[in-house]
Amino acid sequence: MEFRDLKKQYQVLREELDRAVLGAMASGAYIMGPQVRELEQQLAEYVGVKHCLTCANGTDALTLALKAWGIGPGDAVFVPDFTFFSSAEVVPLEGATPVFVDVFEETFNIDAVDLERAVKEVLAEGRLRPRVVVAVDLFGLPADYQAVRAVADRYGLLVLEDGAQGFGGSIQMADQVGHDGNVIPGASHVLAGCDRPSKRACSFGDIATTSFFPAKPLGCYGDGGAVFTDNDEWAALINSYRVHGKGTFKYDNVRIGLNSRLDTVQAAILQVKLKAFAEYELDDINAAAEKYTERLKDIVATPVIPTGFRSSWAQYTIKLKDAAQRDALQAALKAEGIPSMVYYPKPLHLQTAFADPHVGLRPPQDDKGTVRVHQDDKGRFVLPQDDSLSFRAEPQAESRNLNLCPVATSLCSRVLSLPLHPYITEEQIDTVCNAIRKVLR
């Protein structure tokens, strides 16, 4: 059994994919060929934004967004603590400081209440300028953008949507009444089965990004990424930054940029895959996820999809009682030939790369300088079992913020992702669920 069966997908799409790749190879236009621009137009139309600019990978996409906004030293960028490393990695690369924010237990996405607390702490400290919030559409589910946007607007923050895992997800948007009394539609798409317009992932941020890493909801056969925005000025800057800071032509370099282009072969592959994704893959993976939930909801904490939200299911992630139960289940699944993954085993605020107080945040310490969160003999992160830790440590002079992010820390010890993809069979789902029941019954 495959965790994400890319080989099966290729078998289904082989004829179209081979034809597209051979066409790109025969064209001789391997960099920024016509398929790249065609794909950008198709992606922009699918998402419902004015501009889509492809690039080399999802990490570069985030970097390009920060560059377009001029983010740098002295700026605070708020990032969920429970996510892939690159969501925060790009911040210190631009000289700015990541400030980690806790997430919701139910959805795994950024907690807007904790975001506001973190912004207030940064403002009270007075050393950093709050500039950006990175909202991650984790595991395919869009973040709560209504709540995130409310905080962002109150404090003048830009919203960067990290849709690396979220492409294809959506939220039904309530209609709003304008000053003239007329109804303003919440979005440009009406999805099947919805009685209200739905806004798609990668259209919620002031700038949004995605990744085309092969295992993503929409993936190529290498690396790739894209940036989405409705802002003409930012789009022009990103277009410049992605090709060495070019001006009117590629040898007119007006700023320091990157070499970050999606090649023509990958664009041709993505054109084929986007068609399949929109026509049936997104529906099929949602149907498969529903089968998992129906079979498992009485024995384990299954993913929560809020009313009006739709996930693209980059992962199907269950929650166990504790690390011991999670590890035992993973071992039992492995013994039966069933793959599973832990996304993610360590919260960002405990990553070694962010231990330098001039880079990120450090975990809370007691009066002797001892880190209050420690690892057990198996390398798992454990909270102290006493009442001396309030989960909101007092600020230390050398740190930007000492939010422990207890929910994120706990999730890292309890989450387990199961095999899921658009081509998984009901028999395979039953095999996984029966194996889980053997352990948890």
Regions found by a protein language model. Give the residues of each.
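Structural detector of well-ordered beta-strand residues that form the stable sheet scaffold
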Residues: 53, 78, 99, 159-160, ...
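Short beta-strand->loop structural element characteristic of the AMP-binding/adenylate-forming
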Residues: 81, 97-107, 341
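Hydrophobic "anchor" residues on beta-strands that sit immediately upstream
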Residues: 1, 76, 157-158
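Active-site phosphate-binding strand-loop segment of PLP-dependent enzymes
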Residues: 106-220, 227-228
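Phosphate-binding glycine-rich loop
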Residues: 28-76, 90-94, 100-102
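Conserved coil-to-alpha-helix start sites within the AMP-binding
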Residues: 83-88
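N-terminal "arm"/small-domain region of PLP-dependent enzymes with the aminotransferase-like
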Residues: 1-29, 34, 419
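PLP-dependent aminotransferase class I/II
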Residues: 36-42, 49-50, 113, 132-136, ...
